[in-house]
Amino acid sequence: MDKLIIRGGRPLNGDVRISGAKNAVLPILASTLLADSPMTIGNVPHLQDVTTTMELLGRMGASLTVDERMHIEVDPTTTHDFVAPYELVKTMRASILVLGPMLARFGQAEVSMPGGCAIGSRPVNLHVDGLAAMGADISIDSGYIRARADRLKGARIVMDIVSVTGTENLMMAAALARGTTVIENAAREPEVVDLANCINTMGGQISGAGTDTIVIDGVETLHGCHYDVLPDRIETGTFLVAGAITGGKVRLRNTAPATLDAVLAKLEEAGAQMNIGEDWIELDMVGRRPRSVGLRTAPYPAFPTDMQAQFMALNSVAEGTAAIVETVFENRFMHALELQRMGADIRVEGNTALVRGVPKLTGAPVMATDLRASASLILAGLVAEGETLVDRIYHIDRGYECIEEKLSQLGASIRRVPG
């Protein structure tokens, strides 16, 4: 099992290109099942979750090719097996995203109950109840969600809680349904908007994405197209924190600043100087120690839960004390224990972590517990005195493309070693 070895204490400096968004490319790959002809997806990040999704589509019979630029062509017309098996789904919760499009396009689907990051309950009932409201015959049996429908019918669906994958699954299913579907209390994330834009490019009729009410007028068929995935706002935020925590100056290219308002506001509150263009962000923290920032995670457009761990690392070496409140997922403070091993002063009570900044962290062996937790440990390692060894980095490969190469490009001392 690979590990990362980091020698801290080097301010980062330089520019780096941001990859396509993991949380956008996975539903967009699932949406290719809706098309009646081949699709090409561009700006695809080279990630383990992308590989898993491609393997899942291939297992179902779709034909896939990848070129040297990581453009993925998917021909869904050869799909013949409508099962998403446990051995693939258990590694990635996003596998449930094939349920809606598979049912809408082929009238049947069997998807194993999902796995992925160990960060709490993410119930599938929102997906199941929404599809049932659209006329699907659904059962959960032997760990599988089994669904059938001749053709789904438009429905008014009110989501009990805001769910990104729930919104995406129902939006894809509704794209080929008969009539109009209205999703209320819908997720507003930029990745939901990107999926809607992709489906509309395929000939769909979706309006309201980015608001809490999405209207989908079902169409008879959707065609293949070329679509470029939007830049990854979480990778962007992570590299901005890397610049801030090390007292560096970084410029990020091929990003989407408009998707990052809450994160950029917190970085400015921490004392970072920011320059922002249409598709680039420059952060300057040279010669300054960050100030502690309190934050509360919530669905978009509020502060993203996927940036909570990175800001905990930043607060660990900041001036002052601040509270971090996690409202989206339970059990998402596992990185706090590992940061404490490096000397961080963190007290966790329920869904709140109180972080008192210390002058320095010390390198130590630490273990990644989930995707964003692993990013926080790398960030802590970049600023710690001495050597930090991060174990179980397969988590990081699920969501960050070539992270050690990009950080090295900015001047970090970081290398991957085999386990």
Curated annotation (Swiss-Prot):
A UniProt-annotated Pfam family: EPSP_synthase
EC number: 2.5.1.7
Positions contributing to phosphoenolpyruvate binding: K22, N23
GO biological process per UniProt: cell division; cell wall organization; peptidoglycan biosynthetic process; regulation of cell shape; UDP-N-acetylgalactosamine biosynthetic process
Binding of UDP-N-acetyl-alpha-D-glucosamine, residues: R93, D306, V328
CDD domains listed in its UniProt record: UdpNAET (cd01555)
Cross-referenced HAMAP family: MurA (MF_00111)
Protein name as annotated: UDP-N-acetylglucosamine 1-carboxyvinyltransferase
